[in-house]
Structures are given as structure tokens and as C-alpha cells.
């Protein structure tokens, strides 16, 4: 098989190709004349067309892809187009013996960072999901390593599969998280990757983002549905494995998203709270505060008289920590105060929060004003953030309800206001927003 068949030798592009071939000093170290005498590459002159032609004809197996690769290296789009017209196979990988790996021309173009060349190769049929590369990286993996968002979007729009793992078990978005590339993560999330594919350690994208302490990326992943209680190979949940290694604010985010503070790792014989205490002694920090408050709150909402077996197993250990028990008592005291203080409609502050946990937003909306007046935030320092969270939910719900009810009251005059209000309460926030 000839790289350049005889029928195209006389095309006007031949001299351009030959000149380029010599000019770039391709990977050939020696060339041979008729007598098989080696001549150094530097002795070849631009007019030695016959010599170069013989070289190409005598080594046709991989010269086409080599010339194409060199054209990509020098970003010669004119040469690339000519080679593609001649039928050079864009999916033929060039093997590098010293690296024991292959490298497609699409990988190479992505590595160089030339979007136009990448686009040309994709149009010519280059495999966008080619994994014949170092560590079985796809072109998308490389684009993310280069932090090239334009090429990443081009590959995604061309059908790049975000769920292909490399030899380390990393899908492309794992690479973006490792590089703390928030912009790239944002782009990748728009194409709906599977966030639960784990790497070789069994860690999901969220798991690694939490350990990397990147608050913004953690928030993005949570907003896009990443599971908060996935487990790694060792059987640790995200909360358990990161509680003593990440930012305290991230711990709070995980807890607010429903991370289980009671998860017991049998091998460790710890739940997140006791594991944190074990690692940090009796230090009292925001992390301990959030863990205890969430644990106590959940235990009361679920009508649990005592803590879960995870705490019981470590009871002797936890009871020996004075500051831990002191803070635990503060949490429980605030719970008792919440059960006493009324927020209106015969509901206590605790009932209000419990309603929020159950997504009963109508209850929140009905007593929101009295709650705002009646709650003394100085008395609820520990659970202040939780109360504020549901106040925002209640305010938004009430705003939507009032707007729609007032609108309907002006047109429906034969029904009492309260009846209209009850009817409107049956609607979801999305349905309310659609009514103008």
C-alpha cells in the first residue's frame, strides 16, 4: 500500500508535501541511496524529491501517520488537509517503543491545544473516545489536564463519553476535581456525567472534592445530585473518612444535605463524631458542633430516646471527654427550649423545624411571621443556622402563596379568602411560579 499512489504523484500538492516532509526533519535518523550507504539527515536537500519519495514508498506502514503528526506539531493546517484528502487514517495510532504506548493524532492535537486542528480531525472521523493512550486517557481526559475548556466543550459536543475511566479509574470530571478546576467542572456537569463512578480507591467525585477541601466544587456536585453517603473501598462514607481531614464548612454542607452522622464503620468501631474525637482528642471546633447538633436533632426528630448503636459502642470513650459531653448537653438544652417556645398556630419552634424536615412548606409559611417575631436567636446559637434555613424556605413559600391567592381573590369573588388559600396550598412552588 502506497502512502501517495502513483496516480497522485503529479498533483500540484506533491511538492508542498515533500518540502514539508524534509523541512520538519521527521523522525528518521538516516536515509539510504541506491548503494544502501547511510547519509545523515542534514545532507538531504529540499530538491531531493526522488530520495524522499523512495523513503515514503519503502516505509508505507506508518509514514502517513507520522507526517500527519508532524503537521499537527507544526500546526500546518494546509498540510493536514492535504494528507486527509490523500486518505491518511486519523485513527491509526503511532507506537512509541520507549514509552510502550500508543498516541492517536487526536490525542496529540488536544495535547498541543489547537482547537481548529481538533475540529478538523473530528470532522475527518477521528475517534473521540480513543483510549489507546498513556493510562488509557481519552482525548477529553487530556483536554481537562490541559485546562482547555474550549476543546473540552468541542469534544463533548462531538460525543465524548464522560463516563469512560482511565487506568486509575478516573472519569474526566475526577481529573477536573483533582486540578481544582471549577470552571471545567461547571462545563462537565452540563453534560450530565455519572457522579457515582468510583476511582480505584472506591471514591466518587464528591468524595475526592471533599478531601481536597474545595467548597465551591463540593457545592456544585451536591446541587447536581451527588450522593452524600457513598462508601469507598474501605467502607467509609464521605463524612466518616473526611471528618478530620476537610474544611468544617464542608462538614456542615454534607450534614445539611442529609449525610448520616450515625453511620457506623464496624472495622473502625466509630461513627463520624467519635472518629473525630478520637483523632483530635477533646478539641471543640465547628466540626464537633455541627456533628453533635445534627446527631442530636435527628435523634429527636426520629423520636429516638437514646443515640444509635454507633454511640453506644463508643459510650465509654465519648463519656470520658468532658467538653464533648458539655457541648452535647448544650444541644439538648436548646432542643428542650425549642419544644417550649411557641411560634404560632400552637406550634413550637421544634415543630416548625420538624415540619421543615418533612418538606411541609405550608406549615412553615403559615407560622413564619410569628416565628420571626417570637424566636430569640440568642437562645438558639447552636441551631441558629438550621432555623434560618427553614425561615428562608417558609418566607419563599409564603411569598408565592400570597401572590397567587391575592391574584385569584380579585377574580374569584364568590369564595372566601381562606378557602382560596387552602386550594392554593395544594399547589407546588413550581406550579405557583407559573401563575402570573
Swiss-Prot record:
ANK repeat boundaries on the chain: 63-92, 101-130, 135-164, 168-197, 201-230, 234-266
PROSITE patterns assigned to the protein according to its UniProt record, in alphabetical order: ANK_REP_REGION (PS50297), ANK_REPEAT (PS50088), FBOX (PS50181)
Disulfide bonds: none
Transmembrane segments: none
SUPFAM superfamilies the UniProt entry points to: Ankyrin repeat
Alphabetically ordered keywords of this record: ANK repeat, Repeat
Top-level taxon: Viruses
Record flagged with keyword Transport: no
SMART domains: ANK
Signal sequence segment: none
Domain F-box per the UniProt entry, residue ranges: 409-436
Protein name, UniProt field: Putative ankyrin repeat protein FPV026
Species for this entry: Fowlpox virus (strain NVSL) (FPV)
Source species taxonomy: Viruses, Varidnaviria, Bamfordvirae, Nucleocytoviricota, Pokkesviricetes
Amino acid at each position: 500500500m502506497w502512502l501517495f499512489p502513483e496516480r497522485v504523484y503529479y498533483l500540484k500538492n506533491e511538492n508542498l508535501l515533500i518540502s514539508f516532509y524534509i523541512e520538519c526533519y521527521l523522525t528518521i535518523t538516516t536515509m539510504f541511496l541506491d548503494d544502501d550507504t547511510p547519509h545523515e539527515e542534514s545532507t538531504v536537500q529540499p530538491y531531493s524529491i526522488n530520495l524522499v519519495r523512495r523513503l515514503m514508498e519503502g516505509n508505507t506502514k506508518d509514514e502517513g501517520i507520522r507526517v500527519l503528526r508532524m503537521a499537527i506539531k507544526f500546526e500546518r493546517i494546509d498540510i493536514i488537509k492535504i494528507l486527509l484528502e490523500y486518505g491518511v487514517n486519523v485513527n491509526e495510532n503511532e507506537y512509541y517503543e520507549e514509552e510502550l504506548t500508543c498516541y492517536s493524532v487526536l490525542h496529540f492535537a488536544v495535547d498541543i491545544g489547537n482547537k481548529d486542528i481538533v475540529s478538523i480531525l473530528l470532522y475527518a472521523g477521528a475517534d473521540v473516545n480513543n483510549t489507546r493512550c498513556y493510562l488509557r486517557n481519552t482525548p477529553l481526559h487530556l483536554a481537562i489536564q490541559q485546562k482547555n475548556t474550549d476543546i473540552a466543550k468541542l469534544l463533548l459536543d462531538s460525543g465524548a463519553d464522560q463516563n469512560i475511566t482511565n487506568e486509575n479509574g478516573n472519569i474526566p470530571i475526577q481529573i477536573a476535581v483533582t486540578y481544582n478546576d471549577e470552571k471545567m467542572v461547571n462545563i462537565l456537569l452540563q453534560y450530565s456525567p455519572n457522579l457515582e463512578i468510583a476511582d480505584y480507591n472506591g471514591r466518587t467525585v464528591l468524595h475526592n472534592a471533599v478531601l481536597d477541601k474545595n467548597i465551591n466544587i463540593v457545592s456544585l456536585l451536591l446541587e447536581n445530585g451527588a450522593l452524600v453517603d457513598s462508601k469507598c473501598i474501605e467502607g467509609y462514607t464521605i463524612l466518616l473518612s473526611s471528618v478530620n481531614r476537610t474544611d468544617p464548612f464542608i462538614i456542615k454542607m454534607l450534614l445539611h444535605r442529609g449525610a448520616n452522622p450515625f453511620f457506623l464503620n464496624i472495622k473502625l468501631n466509630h461513627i463520624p463524631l467519635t472518629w473525630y474525637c478520637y483523632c483530635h482528642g477533646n478539641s471543640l471546633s465547628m466540626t464537633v458542633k455541627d456533628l453533635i447538633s445534627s446527631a442530636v436533632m435527628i435523634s429527636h426528630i426520629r423520636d429516638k430516646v437514646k443515640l444509635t448503636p454507633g454511640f453506644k459502642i463508643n459510650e465509654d470513650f465519648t463519656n470520658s471527654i468532658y467538653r464533648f459531653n458539655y457541648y452535647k448537653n448544650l444541644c439538648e438544652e436548646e432542643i428542650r427550649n425549642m419544644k417550649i417556645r411557641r411560634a404560632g398556630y400552637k406550634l413550637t419552634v421544634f415543630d416548625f423545624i420538624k415540619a421543615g424536615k418533612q418538606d411541609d412548606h405550608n406549615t412553615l409559611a403559615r407560622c413564619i411571621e410569628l416565628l420571626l417575631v417570637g424566636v430569640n436567636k440568642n437562645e438558639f446559637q447552636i441551631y441558629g443556622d438550621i432555623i434560618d434555613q427553614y425561615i428562608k424556605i417558609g418566607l419563599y413559600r409564603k411569598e408565592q402563596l400570597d401572590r397567587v391567592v391575592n391574584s385569584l381573590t380579585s377574580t374569584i369573588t364568590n369564595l372566601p379568602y381562606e378557602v382560596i388559600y387552602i386550594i392554593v396550598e395544594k399547589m407546588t412552588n413550581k406550579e405557583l411560579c407559573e401563575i402570573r
